[in-house]
């Protein structure tokens, strides 16, 4: 099966290249090297899926969704952060920095770094302990068991929220795959997107959580190599670090943390304190990301979370710093005439692809490195898409079909339902990603807000407030998700102080809803509060 996929991939690529415009009728040696490197990388990913599938990692629901809670600290840390740092790490962040300068992208990165650390510090330990005690293997299942929701209304709503926001999130990943091959080789966008999606689905359905987590570890290594190599090459091509700084300084507001550069007008724009708070609010999203917090539940030993936290935080800080630098460096490479100026959001998000293409023209070794860099972009996309597909599959087969709808399924039927869900959501994601001009950063931003507001407050209150009840949790979840849509499409367009990132007001509204509704309704049952005291202390 894997061999057939790679043959199809190469055939699609060759057909597209050979039917391109005149003057580009043959693959160059550099392009062949890059394709071989990427195909070997994809082969390695499928091999991991086959390996863990044969080991039985996808044979039971507990193994398929949570790896049997056997994850070591390094794999847990890197899997969590690789699944977090989707295509926006190697496309969204550099693209925004290239186009608009430091303010928005840097404050966003700072918020994400703080959010990462706090998530590991205050959520990880209690969630690992609590979920193990309750026997929960998904986030919706944890909410239902934590609040004693025997009717599983909470898990049903949570599963619907996951589907609503994961589908566009996954679509942004498939869009990145299509953009990669279209920008570099001229491969038809939709063909590349479909083939890349097939590979992601293949190793996800075969190996489950363990395959996803170990491929995430491998992919985080590729992402790191890509970032380091491209920043060094970019500085050299731009004419040195001094040239990079001079070029950036010449643009009004480009390096100013309280202004910003308006690429459309070539002038500085104000970046207010409200805007800074708004972008820092990205960090709030971590508390509600199902595909990230699931890693906390899967670690082998609770005591190993401290090591995981240190590894994860260091990697996130370094990788985002380099990603922002690449955007700034990329502008100077354009100024030097080495790559074209990129004037739109969709174009600027291809800056790393353009730099890798430039690198591939400087000999065999650098062509191989370019292939590794482009594999890193695939890694950033695939490491998030696979985790999201797995989380969505668990929501449908476990939380909706079995818990909410009461369907009785044996182990084999459960696994078939999970794998069918992975395929179905991937197909819907590809349909939504059909437009090649959509922005990765903006799509991820909206989905991030949805999860952060709908799940983040509920997660925090479930772990730290004994009085929170199922009515309050339900109110918070619905309020958070609804306010994201309302603020994004009705309030933010009013401009001014209203044009803040929708996650912040939605998160606050959800917190208020949880407190008010919990206090206005009966206290949780004694069994629920006794479990809370046992796990979290009185």
Task: Give residue spans per PLM region.
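Membrane-embedded helix-loop-helix hairpins and adjacent transmembrane boundary segments
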Residues: 13-16, 23, 27-538
């Amino acid at each position: 099966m894997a061999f057939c996929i790679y043959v199809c991939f190469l055939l699609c690529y060759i057909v597209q290249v050979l039917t391109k415009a005149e003057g580009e009728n043959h693959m160059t040696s550099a392009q062949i090297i890059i394709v071989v490197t990427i195909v070997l990388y994809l082969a390695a990913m499928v091999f991991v899926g086959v390996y863990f599938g044969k080991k039985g990692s996808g044979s039971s629901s507990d193994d398929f969704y949570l790896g049997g809670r056997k994850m070591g600290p390094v794999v847990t840390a890197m899997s969590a952060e690789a699944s977090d740092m989707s295509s926006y790490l190697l496309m969204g962040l550099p693209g925004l920095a290239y186009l608009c300068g430091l303010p928005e992208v840097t404050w966003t990165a700072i918020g994400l770094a703080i959010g990462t650390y706090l998530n590991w510090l205050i959520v990880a330990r209690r969630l690992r302990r609590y979920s193990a005690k309750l026997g929960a293997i998904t986030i919706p299942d944890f909410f239902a068991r934590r609040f004693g929701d025997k009717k599983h209304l909470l898990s049903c709503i949570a599963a619907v929220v996951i589907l609503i926001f994961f589908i566009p999130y996954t679509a942004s990943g498939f869009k990145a795959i299509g953009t990669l091959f279209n920008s570099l080789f001229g491969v038809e966008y939709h063909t590349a997107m479909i083939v890349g999606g097939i590979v992601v689905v293949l190793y996800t359905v075969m190996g489950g959580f363990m395959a996803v987590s170990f491929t995430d570890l491998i992919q985080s290594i590729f992402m790191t190599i890509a970032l380091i190599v491209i920043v060094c090459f970019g500085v050299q091509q731009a004419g040195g670090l001094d040239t990079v700084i001079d070029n950036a300084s010449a643009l009004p507001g480009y390096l100013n943390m309280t202004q910003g550069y308006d690429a459309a007008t070539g002038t500085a724009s104000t970046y207010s304190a409200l805007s800074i708070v708004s972008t820092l609010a990205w960090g709030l999203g971590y508390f509600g990301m199902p595909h990230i917090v699931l890693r906390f539940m899967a670690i082998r030993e609770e005591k190993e979370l401290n090591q995981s936290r240190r590894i994860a935080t260091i990697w996130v800080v370094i990788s985002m710093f380099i990603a922002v630098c690449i955007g700034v460096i990329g502008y100077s490479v354009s100024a030097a005439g080495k790559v074209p100026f990129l004037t739109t959001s969709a174009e600027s998000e291809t800056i790393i692809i353009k730099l890798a293409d430039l690198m591939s023209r400087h000999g065999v070794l650098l062509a191989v490195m370019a292939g590794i860099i482009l594999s890193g972009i695939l890694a950033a996309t695939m490491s998030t898409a696979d985790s999201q597909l797995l989380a969505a599959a668990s929501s449908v087969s476990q939380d909706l079909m079995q818990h909410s709808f009461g369907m009785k399924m044996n182990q084999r039927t459960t696994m078939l339902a999970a794998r069918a869900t992975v395929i179905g959501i991937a197909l819907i994601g590809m349909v939504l990603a059909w437009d090649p001009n959509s922005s990765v950063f903006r799509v991820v931003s909206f989905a991030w807000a949805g999860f952060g507001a709908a799940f983040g407050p509920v997660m925090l209150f479930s772990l730290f407030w004994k009085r929170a009840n199922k009515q309050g949790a339900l109110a918070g979840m619905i309020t958070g998700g609804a306010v994201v849509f309302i603020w994004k499409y009705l309030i933010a367009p009013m401009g001014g102080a209203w044009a803040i990132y929708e996650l912040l007001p939605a998160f606050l509204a959800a917190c208020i809803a949880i407190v008010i509704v919990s206090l206005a309704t009966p206290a949780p049952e004694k069994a629920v509060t006794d479990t809370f005291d046992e796990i979290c202390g009185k």
